[in-house]
Amino acid sequence: MSQREAGQVDLEAWQPRTRVGRLVKEGKIKSIDEIFRRNLPILETEIVDYLLPGLDHEVIDVSIVQKMTDAGRITRFRAVVVVGNKDGYVGLGKGKARQFRFAIEKAIRNAKLNIIPVRRGCGSWECTCGEAHSVPFTVRGKSGSVEVILKPAPKGTGLVAGDVAKVVLRLAGISDVWTFTKGETRTSYNFARATYLALRNTYRFVTPADWAEARLRL
């Protein structure tokens, strides 16, 4: 199930509740990269809607959870959603609610709050195209028992990954990658989160390009 987020939030009527939100609404922060560069917290989904309009989202898992209370058994839906612009930004979230639609809406909001930048590149020695179609180097992520390793692949390889990981990679803008997995990958959330954390680790290393960009800002 894939849809495009459009027109859900009235940004003109948005009244920011945080300092970062006010800076965005006033035009003092003009890009989401500036937020990540300054390590500022994203606590309002409208910040993401304002700076990254037109995000896609895809529901990767919906399950029913039950809880026993004094009033009896309460049944709720749990949804796991991935959001991304297919161009270097991706987020993962989950939400619970008594109604299916509200669970998805809550998961989308949480995914937007968890949005991260993804460094892309052409890291395979078999490919010298220089385009941002894969990961620039090998990265790994772990969630629960699931570990995911992403390795650069030459252009045209495609996404050699499980269905859940493919969704995360595609919405992040990765089109070619080798993946290696360990653990219980049937657990959709842990599989998706391990992939998400591996992509987050693409910015854990400082590259020569980062130093060059830092010098230009000085």
Curated annotation (Swiss-Prot):
GO terms for molecular function: rRNA binding; structural constituent of ribosome. GO terms for biological process: translation. Residues 55-118 form the S5 DRBM domain. Gene3D superfamilies: 3.30.160.20, 3.30.230.10. InterPro entries: Ribosomal_Su5_D2-typ_SF, Ribosomal_uS5, Ribosomal_uS5_arc, Ribosomal_uS5_C, Ribosomal_uS5_euk/arc, Ribosomal_uS5_N, Ribosomal_uS5_N_CS, Ribsml_uS5_D2-typ_fold_subgr. GO terms for cellular component: cytosolic small ribosomal subunit. PANTHER family: 40S RIBOSOMAL PROTEIN S2, RIBOSOMAL S SUBUNIT. The N-terminal domain interacts with the head of the 30S subunit; the C-terminal domain interacts with the body and contacts protein S4. The interaction surface between S4 and S5 is involved in control of translational fidelity. With S4 and S12 plays an important role in translational accuracy. NCBIfam families: PRK04044.1, uS5_euk_arch. Part of the 30S ribosomal subunit. Contacts protein S4. Belongs to the universal ribosomal protein uS5 family. This is Small ribosomal subunit protein uS5. It comes from Aeropyrum pernix (strain ATCC 700893 / DSM 11879 / JCM 9820 / NBRC 100138 / K1). The lineage of its organism: Archaea, Thermoproteota, Thermoprotei, Desulfurococcales, Desulfurococcaceae.
